[in-house]
């Protein structure tokens, strides 16, 4: 199980139950709809199903009955690779991505990981800023990693963060 950090976003109504729980197959319709609303090049239902089938860590963050966001991560030996982190558009810019990142770091440490890895679109300035705040540093660039349009590609910034116990 993944724990929530103590400092949840202050804008959240105090009467709502906020919980982070494992993502299930039954959640995928809502998750995919959120993914499509959040991104121009979203993960597909098949991507999420494959992640669940592979046993990746997949968690959803709920406030009351609403899906706030989710993350999917893969543990390999002593490293954790963040594959997807998304906050629903209605909840963006309220501190929920930071909450998910803190939860991921806590979970990764509990799994014995010594570092976190991720890729992010070179144009995703908000995400790059968030990751830098959380101690990630650029360690590489993957040219033409992401689709940008039918004819263009976009590079991925590869980032890593050591986890200190």
Per-region residue spans from a language model:
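Acetyl-CoA-dependent GNAT
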Residues: 3-94, 98-107, 111, 144, ...
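Flexible coil/turn residues that form the inter-helical turn or adjacent wing/linker of helix-turn-helix
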Residues: 41, 114, 152
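Surface-exposed loop and edge beta-strand positions of immunoglobulin-like domains
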Residues: 21, 119-121
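Short amphipathic helical patch at the helix-1/turn junction of helix-turn-helix
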Residues: 87, 121-122
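Conserved catalytic-core motifs of GNAT/GCN5-like acyltransferases
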Residues: 3, 117-119, 132, 137-154
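ABC family nucleotide-binding domain
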Residues: 91, 96, 130-132, 153-157
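Short glycine/proline-centered loop/turn elements that form peptide/ligand docking sites
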Residues: 101, 124-127, 144-150
């Amino acid at each position: 199980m993944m724990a929530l950090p103590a400092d949840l976003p202050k804008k959240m109504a105090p009467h709502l139950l906020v919980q982070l729980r494992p993502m299930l197959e039954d959640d995928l319709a809502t998750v995919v709809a959120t993914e499509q609303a959040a991104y121009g090049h979203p993960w597909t239902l098949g991507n999420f199903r494959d992640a669940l089938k592979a046993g990746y860590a997949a968690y959803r963050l709920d406030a009351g009955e609403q899906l706030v966001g989710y993350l999917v991560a893969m543990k390999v030996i002593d490293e954790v690779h963040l594959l997807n982190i998304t906050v629903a558009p209605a909840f963006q810019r309220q501190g929920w991505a930071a909450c998910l990142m803190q939860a991921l770091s806590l979970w990764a440490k509990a799994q014995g990981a010594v570092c976190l890895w991720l890729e992010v679109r070179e144009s995703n300035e908000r995400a790059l800023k968030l990751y830098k705040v959380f101690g990630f540093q650029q360690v590489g660039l993957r040219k033409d990693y992401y689709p940008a349009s039918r004819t263009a590609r976009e590079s991925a910034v590869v980032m890593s963060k050591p986890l200190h116990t």
